[in-house]
Amino acid sequence: VLRPLLKACREGLRLETDYVSFTTPVAETRLIAPHTLVYTGMRWHVRAYCEKNGAYRDFVLSRLRGEPDVLDISEFSREADTGWNTRVNVIIEPDQRLTAEQKRIIEIDYGMQNGQLIVPSRGALVQYVLQRFQIDANKVESKASAQQIVVANLDALQPWLYH
């Protein structure tokens, strides 16, 4: 799987590959134009243009089936991937419901400066940053001691979150 994938990334080529997902659990042929391998801290993905969906997507490497076939040059490059090329900061703060003493503990735990941890990211990778910090953008824990940290700029990150 890796050899054709790396060749396609390096040379800007399209691939034909079988892929499974939660929404399509039976292998389905996809034509993709991969540009970058990404390790999220939990698993490997390839960032690629998906011809089926007409958009740049992340494909989990372990869900590729069989060996991909290398095709021709792709018109969809890394430079055209807005999500990849947009730089954003994920700003993490202690949950405001904590006491001042508890906030200070969290600030030290996470190496925060002025009560914030600023995590630079690409737009396309924001969701993985939140997962790494175990932050669910759609849920607030009822107890601040369970939540501990929150995203201060969640509204600005909405375009990059899965909905």
Residue ranges and their predicted role:
Residues 1-163:
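Short glycine- and basic-residue-enriched patches
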